[in-house]
From Swiss-Prot:
PANTHER family in the cross-refs: TRAFFICKING PROTEIN PARTICLE COMPLEX SUBUNIT, TRAFFICKING PROTEIN PARTICLE COMPLEX SUBUNIT 4
UniProt gene name: TRS23
A Pfam cross-reference name: Sybindin
Main localization, broad class: Golgi
Subunit structure: Part of the multisubunit TRAPP (transport protein particle) I complex composed of BET3, BET5, TRS20, TRS23, TRS31 and TRS33. Part of the multisubunit TRAPP (transport protein particle) II complex composed of BET3, BET5, TRS20, TRS23, TRS31, TRS33, TRS65, TRS85, TRS120 and TRS130. Part of the multisubunit TRAPP (transport protein particle) III complex composed of BET3, BET5, TRS20, TRS23, TRS31, TRS33 and TRS85.
Source organism superkingdom: Eukaryota
InterPro entries per UniProt: Longin-like_dom_sf (IPR011012), TRAPPC (IPR007233)
Similarity remark: Belongs to the TRAPP small subunits family. TRAPPC4 subfamily.
The protein's name in its UniProt record: Trafficking protein particle complex subunit 23
Role summary: Component of the TRAPP I, TRAPP II and TRAPP III complexes which act as guanine nucleotide exchange factors (GEF) for YPT1. TRAPP I plays a key role in the late stages of endoplasmic reticulum to Golgi traffic. TRAPP II plays a role in intra-Golgi transport. TRAPP III plays a role in autophagosome formation.
Lineage, top ranks: Eukaryota, Fungi, Dikarya, Ascomycota, Saccharomycotina
Protein's cellular compartments: Golgi apparatus, cis-Golgi network; Endoplasmic reticulum; Preautophagosomal structure
Length: 219
């Protein structure tokens, strides 16, 4: 999955972070990204209202809201090599600290999907967009150059063989794992910055560097 753009949208629909990872000359300008962020915020709210009321009242008991943990999404390949019995030449990478997070990954357990009624994925003929929403309403958006096919082949699951998983769902799960790690970087390098004000644009070189490295590892 090749990520072209990362956006962070606050709970009011304002764009507080935008970063491109390609050298495309036809990329949007700053004003167009602001319009895109507010439009996504509005579409997200509309999609939430389109959810049948019966599902909202029953807390969507028939829909799984737990995202499975996918190991080492966006992490250095040397970490997984060491985990799988790699040589001593990889130990220096495995010992790199993840900010205030301990271990060789930001998390290692399934997590709750707080986006239970809004937009999670948008597929077009040119790109695919993934949206991860936090409990506080902050939205992390990843725009990928990968295009999902219209007819999705299925992948059989071991835990529930009677319910095949489409490659589209797998892509969403990978994106959710990746964007949650971007959220971990946000909580570590942005929220702990004493000079940062809530809901304001993010100006953090450390956050930029960590996000860029994670995107490069994903490709």
């Amino acid at each position: 999955m090749a990520i072209e753009t990362i956006l962070v949208i606050n709970k009011s629909g304002g764009l507080i972070y935008q970063r491109n990872f390609t050298n495309d000359e036809q990329k949007l300008n700053s004003n167009e990204y602001l319009i895109l962020a507010s439009t996504l915020h509005g579409v997200f709210a509309i999609a939430s209202q389109l959810t049948p009321k019966a599902l909202q009242l029953t807390q969507q008991t028939n829909i799984e809201n737990t995202i499975p943990y996918i190991p080492y999404v966006g992490m250095s390949s040397n970490r997984s090599d060491t985990r799988n019995g790699g040589g001593n030449n990889n130990k220096h990478t495995n010992n790199e600290k993840l900010g205030s997070f301990k271990g060789d990954d930001f998390f290692k357990e399934p997590f709750t999907n707080w986006n239970k009624s809004g937009l999670r994925q948008l597929c077009t003929d040119q790109f695919t967009m993934f949206i991860y929403q936090t409990l506080t309403g902050l939205k992390f958006v990843a725009i990928s150059s990968s295009v999902m096919p219209q007819r999705q082949p299925t992948i059989a699951t071991t835990d529930k063989p009677d319910r095949p998983k489409s490659t589209s769902n797998l892509a969403i799960q990978i994106a959710d794992n990746f964007l949650r790690k971007v959220y971990c970087l946000y909580s570590d390098y942005v929220m702990k910055d004493p000079s940062y004000s809530m809901e304001m644009p993010i100006r953090s070189n450390l956050f930029d560097e960590k996000v860029k490295k994670m995107v490069e590892n994903l490709q």
